[in-house]
């Protein structure tokens, strides 16, 4: 549902807890406990700005990104393990090193600088959130389970990672290619990662 559609169908007074359904020529009364939850992020604002009157009807909760690399790696590791069990993926739990590599890529591209602070980087248009890192890792786990040998390798992560970074096919592709060439290619122990991601592009 697009933003403009949400704006036109939300009740003018949320206290009424009634939602009109014009297509059915009726109104639906909310049950006890009903809530509308809207999510957003600071990089993807959509096409239509919400009015300040509408925004005041929501409680705003800001979830900052994890402060440290270790904290983000721990969150991704825990959630990927939970999702792997829930989805009953017959693959080995990903090595912490693979999670650390994905989180490193996300953090460096988000921050616009390498972890050592020596190289400035262009930032892509996407958010590269922790949730996306979890998604990339879970996708890699599924790839390893169903198309690989059950152990996660760089090739299992390459497509998901490239898709997470490249949202704009022109600008983000340039950002990703530059990052691969200037950072990943010469990084110690990342040759397999570089080759796998380069093959996807």
Predicted regions and their residues:
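AAA+ ATPase "lid" subdomain C-terminal helix
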Residues: 108-116, 130, 134-154, 163-170
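Non-catalytic, well-ordered alpha-helical scaffold segments
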Residues: 4, 8, 100, 131-138, ...
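Short acidic/histidine-centered micro-motifs embedded in hydrophobic/aromatic stretches
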Residues: 13, 105, 157-160
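C-terminal engagement/docking regions of AAA+ P-loop ATPases
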Residues: 145-201
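Conserved C-terminal "switch" segment of AAA+ ATPases
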Residues: 45-49, 60-125, 146-150, 188-199
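Canonical AAA+ ATPase core
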Residues: 1-9, 14-88, 141-143
